[in-house]
Amino acid sequence: MKNVFFALLAALMLAGMLAGCMNSSEVPMGSATAAPSQTEAPAHTKISIVTTIFPEYDWVREILGDKADSAEITMLLDNGVDLHSYQPTADDIIKLSDCDLFVYVGGESDGWVEDALKSAANRDRKVIHLLDVLGDSVKEEETVEGMQEEEEDHEEKEYDEHVWLSLKNAKTLVGAISAALQELDPDNKDTYAANAEAYGQKLSALDAEYQKAVSAGTYKTLLFGDRFPFRYLVDDYGLSYYAAFVGCSAESEASFETVSFLARKVDEGKLPCVMTIEGKNHKIAETIVQNTAGKNQKILTMDSMQSTTAQDVANGTTYLSLMAKNLDVLKEALG
């Protein structure tokens, strides 16, 4: 697989160089062949920023503010494909190869990135690895009572990738992105610093609203008939949880034992809701409800932002708007 990756990348780079030799005026912005001669004006002055997922993309936009026109921002996962099943296209690799700043999560789902970075054309490119930024705050994946075990054994430690679902983490990560942008574009560093500070205040305010909702809630446990990517969020506010699968699970069918256990926990805790994440398939949650004594629990959905699309962005979706919607759902779940 790795040989195929390198062969593809080499072919793409060669094609770009040949195109540049034939007609330098037609080289696309961001191409690795667009370096100017000593007497030629630079092909572009925009900062090229590539992000993998929506939260990173939206944070970059917020930090740039009214300077967004000075940058070319790409969100690789913009068509609804889940983070855990994404595979980069040839065009994605070219964009990453020549960008000035690359922001990615850095978990198991980003296993393709290492080879891409080694082959990148822009050796001066800055890279922000979210898990590295957070350091010891990153949590190991955990299997709680009743959670279905993975069929595939993992010898190495696995870390929970879903760090963006903590508002506290978001504030730290925004600071790291702001610092990188200030280095890339020192003429506008004061603007980026001020924008990051203002956005951080919004994150802190929403964080306080979450804490207030949890403190006022009747229940302190969430139960997901689904994967569970909200570990960082529940840990921030001292909530407990049960779930069918871990956050990065590839499983989609819950066993009879898993469903029975979760239904029993709903009854024991008198929980009013069974939770799911975004997506159309809520079959496991529905089956759990049907196996409870009352069979009348509501099914509520929280958005983990793993499938946010370019169309969602065009429609005005932001990180803060989705986290605010998640707060509304959380309030209902906690009673």
Which residue stretches match the model-derived regions?
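Bacterial Sec-type N-terminal signal peptides, specifically the leucine/valine-rich hydrophobic h-region
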Residues: 14-18
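Extracytoplasmic metal-acquisition and chelation regions
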Residues: 21-335
